[in-house]
């Protein structure tokens, strides 16, 4: 925060106070993120889901609690949700579908899976 204060021409105390308020309000989260391409044996999958239910937000919340799910976004278009899923050698795509996604399969009308083979400015929190 010292560097941010210097760049903005503000005191460090001012920046810390503002950052603390943003964190408290849920606007700012300071966390480490990893570049999956630099982690051997890791990959990202994007899982696009068409739901049976019109409760997109409620269903998104359910999917967000599955192991490996980094984030869930509610979409417009032909899919309702897109999940970002972190995978590794011990928890691969088959494990995700067999052990996690299967818990919610009755909520889904169709899915489409995309494997990220190259990302740009793509970093995620390490959750595995």
Sequence positions of predicted segments:
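A compositional/biophysical signature of low hydrophobicity enriched in polar/charged and small residues
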Residues: 1-128
């Amino acid at each position: 925060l010292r560097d941010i204060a210097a760049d903005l021409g503000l005191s460090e105390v001012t920046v810390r106070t503002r950052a603390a308020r943003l964190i408290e309000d849920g606007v700012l989260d300071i966390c480490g993120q990893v570049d999956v391409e630099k982690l051997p044996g890791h990959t990202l999958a994007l899982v696009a889901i068409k739901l049976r239910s019109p409760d997109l937000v409620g269903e998104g919340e359910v999917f967000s609690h599955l192991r490996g799910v980094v984030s869930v976004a509610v979409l417009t278009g032909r899919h309702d949700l897109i999940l970002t899923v972190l995978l590794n050698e011990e928890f691969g795509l088959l494990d995700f579908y067999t052990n996690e996604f299967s818990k919610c399969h009755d909520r889904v009308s169709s899915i489409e899976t995309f494997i990220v083979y190259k990302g740009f400015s793509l970093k995620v929190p390490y959750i595995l």
